[in-house]
Every structure is written in structure tokens, then in C-alpha cells.
Swiss-Prot record:
Protein name: Enolase
Protein family per UniProt: Belongs to the enolase family.
Coiled-coil intervals, chain numbering: none
Keywords: Cytoplasm, Glycolysis, Lyase, Magnesium, Metal-binding
Keyword Lyase included in the entry's annotation: yes
Cofactor-binding details, from the entry: Mg(2+) is required for catalysis and for stabilizing the dimer.
Enzyme class, first EC level, given as a word: lyase
Reaction equation(s) it catalyzes: (2R)-2-phosphoglycerate = phosphoenolpyruvate + H2O
Length: 26
């Protein structure tokens, strides 16, 4: 999981784990 330039790190981490998609949040 890439490190998003924001404070919503846990949110993107959860989404990546749930959907299992190689999505890179910006």
C-alpha cells in the first residue's frame, strides 16, 4: 500500500484490504 499524502491512511488501508485492489491513493 502506498503512503497517501493525507491523514486518511487507515481508510485507504482498509479499502485496499477489503477490495484487494492495487490502488494507489493520492
Amino acid at each position: 500500500a502506498a503512503v497517501p499524502s493525507g491523514a486518511s491512511t487507515g481508510v485507504y488501508e482498509a479499502l485496499e484490504l477489503r477490495f484487494r485492489a492495487p490502488v494507489e491513493p493520492y
